[in-house]
């Protein structure tokens, strides 16, 4: 039978689930599930002050205050739903708002323009729209009336798209509050078997700082979520739970 003196090792990353917070402060319906995390870090910090006195003005009594718990999640993959939650494109219930649209703007580098057709990089032929306002030529020697045959030009067109998902980021919307539960495994020193372990955070605030890195070299981009743990309406700020399946 397990005791509080049993020791365990931790190596595996967490799988994380975000939940709505109900009106009575309990954990509600799931909003987002993450099972592709690379790193999941829970950090607790606090400030400290002490009463000093006597010879050498040494510390006599110490107080801790301003406790903060933060969580950092580094995800190898993203979805439209996870980006919407990270950037604050959510409704009143904290659910992601991802719109659909039928048209998108594309700018192409054009090597030839002839009879309304252009040859795109990669050999794909594309017919330019003829409606006024849908094509804009950026090269000085190319216009809609006298296209010519420039060495290169940039043409911006409105095209019909497929399976488009659009995330609108407004100046007055920010990421919301959620409950968060992280699931992982810890390994017993005695048996060598893995046992289930949970980090339960009844109330966290998704931080607004988001960095989206697009680069040609190096490792694939990861997507970071930074959470600040808040005090819930009832109960502790965080629970660490070991259990057997």
Predicted feature residues:
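Signature of extracytoplasmic/envelope-associated structural regions
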Residues: 2-245
């Amino acid at each position: 039978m397990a005791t509080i003196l049993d020791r365990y090792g931790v190596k595996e990353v967490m799988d994380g689930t975000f939940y709505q917070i109900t009106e009575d402060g309990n954990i509600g319906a799931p909003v987002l599930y993450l099972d592709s995390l690379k790193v999941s870090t829970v950090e607790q910090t606090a400030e400290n002050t002490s009463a000093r006195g006597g010879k050498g003005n040494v510390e006599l009594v110490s107080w801790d205050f301003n406790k903060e718990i933060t969580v950092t999640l580094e995800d190898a993959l993203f979805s439209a739903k996870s980006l919407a939650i990270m950037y604050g494109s959510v409704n009143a219930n904290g659910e992601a708002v991802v719109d659909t649209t039928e048209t998108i703007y594309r700018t192409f580098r054009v090597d030839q323009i002839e009879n309304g057709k252009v040859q795109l990089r990669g050999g794909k032929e594309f017919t330019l729209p003829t409606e006024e306002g849908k094509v804009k030529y950026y090269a000085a020697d190319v216009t809609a009336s006298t296209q010519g045959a420039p060495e290169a030009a940039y043409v911006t067109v409105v095209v019909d798209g497929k399976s488009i998902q659009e995330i609108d980021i407004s100046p007055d919307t920010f990421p919301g509050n959620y409950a968060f539960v992280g699931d992982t495994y810890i390994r017993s020193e005695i048996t060598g078997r893995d046992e289930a372990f949970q980090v339960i955070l009844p109330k966290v605030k998704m931080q607004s700082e988001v960095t989206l890195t697009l680069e040609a070299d190096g490792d694939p981009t990861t997507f970071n979520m930074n959470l600040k743990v808040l005090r819930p309406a009832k109960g502790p700020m965080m629970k660490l739970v070991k259990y057997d399946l």
